[in-house]
Amino acid sequence: MIKGRFPHMFKPRVYITRQIFPDALDLIEKSADLELWPEDEPPSPEQLREAMADVDGAIINVMDRIDAPLLDAAPKLKVLSQVAAGLDNIDVPEATKREILVGYTPGVLAKSTADLAFGLLLAVARRVVESDKWVREGNWKISHHPMFWL
């Protein structure tokens, strides 16, 4: 045996609570045995506790509440990774007390939020919603003047 190294005789078990990109699944599957929640709706707290009872890690979503009762039901859990910018749904002090590593994706939505904000600003400034409704109602046949929709 080489000192300081441990041969991996098994892959850690990882539970994923939502669909993620196939490329990410392929990458994770190279080093872990995966179990993926198959539904679009989130698992109930009971389903989540049951699924995490024998896993080493989990990739979760902001809709999954990770609290002391869930952590009690997941004695092997060593790492949690949240696919979200915040940690409001995770009892981080409790996870830390149990030496469970917690990761998340801060800033992941910053550009998308900025894009949406500018889109909404343009929609309001150019009256896009009102114009869309007007056209859908068949009013586009009516003549307009230079001050129209200003």
Language model region names:
Residues 4-105:
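An N-terminal-biased, well-structured beta-alpha scaffold segment characteristic
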Residues 98-100, 106-150:
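Phosphate-binding beta-alpha-beta segment of Rossmann-like dinucleotide-binding domains, i.e.
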